[in-house]
Design a protein with these regions (language model features):
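Domain-level recognition of nuclease-like catalytic cores that cleave nucleotide substrates
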Residues: 391-409
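Conserved lysine of the Walker
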Residues: 32
């Protein structure tokens, strides 16, 4: 097994020069601890590692946080800090007294904006970052370049990265992006995901919500996976899992909190009044989707009924990972109105809206971009659009609408 360098490494070291605390969140097994422990060796400051997965250590952190910090003195790496939110107030006191950059590195398996106590206690004192499973650019060793529709940037990137065909893209989709699988540490993919669900996900759901029926929860997360890249339908999910809608909503919130799924919200404003309000649901790791929906090989997934949804999930998650890895907030939306006009992704930035369509075709037709015109009604300017597809080379319909191979994202 070899360590796969993460795009976030330099960002962590850079922020550690100005922030006393860094909180890195993300799903379990996404590589947070591995990366930070590798960086600890690199910085060579004698940073101690302590995990709150250990029940004795967790008990001290919760019930006597002052003693915990006396024993585990900074610089320190505290793993799974969400188990002891009581620490945050004492970390704040230490930061205010000492002002030492890089004193506290922390990881958490709950998305930071949903974690109890962080915003109240450490506001302005902590750098908040999110780590997803590996991006395809990390896997192939490419630079961290968040996706853009800037033609010059895209042309330059397409020269640096070796093109791949559709079967290779679906091999990446099916294999997934969890470091343990990609690095070769775990050879049996099915066993890995089975253990991942029972050892980590179900346990964390139980920790957050109390009791949980494992069978019904497995039905539920499978139903979510079967509807990836679709509008979030609580009623259908509840029906499939034989639970009530209140529980379905709670479990969706928990999966989002754990970094298993993310929601893409619709773009709307006062002018575009006919847009729908329901978000779409995606997984950070398409390998988990393929496991849950029982696609036995990349070839079957590529030819199956879900191939379009899998490709869309992969593409949207890759765009999101690129921005997260650069420590930048991604402003991503989709568009759908009551007249059935739809745009898969809208990127907002610099006063412009850049529309993106995702297609499983190597020969995109210009008619695909006809819906981009709905953005003209928005107060923001229509930026350069793109069709993200299986084309082997970069191209363009015209100056304002590009053709971008998905391998280059």
């Amino acid at each position: 097994m070899s360590y796969i360098a993460r795009h976030m490494e330099n960002r962590i070291l850079e922020l550690s020069k100005s922030y006393s605390a860094i909180l890195l969140t993300g799903p379990r097994q996404s590589g947070k601890t591995t990366m930070l422990r590798a960086l600890s060796k690199e910085e060579n400051k004698g940073r101690e590692y302590v995990s709150l997965d250990d029940l004795t250590t967790r008990d001290m952190a919760k019930n006597d946080p002052a003693l915990f910090l006396q024993i585990h003195k900074p610089p320190v790496l505290i793993d799974e800090v969400q188990y002891a939110p009581e620490l945050f107030t004492y970390i704040k006191i230490h930061i205010d007294e000492h002002h030492n950059p890089g004193d506290f590195w922390m990881t958490g398996s709950h998305i930071f904006r949903l974690m109890r106590g962080v915003q109240e206690s450490l506001a302005g004192r902590v750098a908040l970052l999110h780590m997803s499973p590996l991006s395809q650019r990390e896997i192939i060793g490419a630079d961290c370049i968040p996706f853009t529709t800037n033609m010059n940037v895209l042309m330059d990137e397409c020269k640096k990265i070796a093109p791949v065909d559709t079967p290779t893209i679906f091999e990446r989709i099916w294999r997934g992006s969890m470091p343990g699988i990609v690095s070769g540490l775990y050879a049996d993919r099915n066993m890995y995901y089975s253990s991942y669900l029972s050892t980590y996900v179900e346990r964390d759901v139980r920790d957050i919500s109390g009791t949980v029926d494992a069978l019904k929860f497995n039905r539920f997360i499978t139903a979510v996976a079967a509807r990836t890249a679709q509008l979030l339908n609580y009623h259908a999910l509840a029906e499939d899992a034989e639970i009530d809608i209140v529980t379905a909503k709670a479990w969706v919130d928990i999966l989002e909190t754990l970094g298993i799924i993310f929601l893409l919200h619709p773009y709307s404003n006062n002018v575009l009044k006919r847009t729908i309000k329901t978000p779409k649901v995606y997984f950070y790791d398409t390998g988990l989707v393929c496991y849950l929906t029982k696609w036995s090989s990349p070839e079957v997934a590529e030819s199956g009924a879900m191939s379009g949804a899998l490709l869309e999930n992969f593409t949207v998650s890759e765009i999101l990972k690129g921005y997260q890895n650069a420590g930048r907030e991604p402003y991503l939306y989709f568009y759908r109105d009551r007249d059935a006009k739809e745009i898969d992704v809208i990127m907002e930035g610099d006063g412009k809206l850049c529309p993106l369509e995702i297609k499983k075709t190597a020969t995109p037709d210009k008619r695909i971009i006809r819906t981009f015109g709905v953005i003209d009604k928005s107060p923001l300017q229509l930026g350069t659009g793109a069709v993200l597809c299986m084309e082997e080379q970069f191209g363009a319909f015209d100056r304002d609408n590009l053709i971008v191979p998905i391998w280059a994202i």
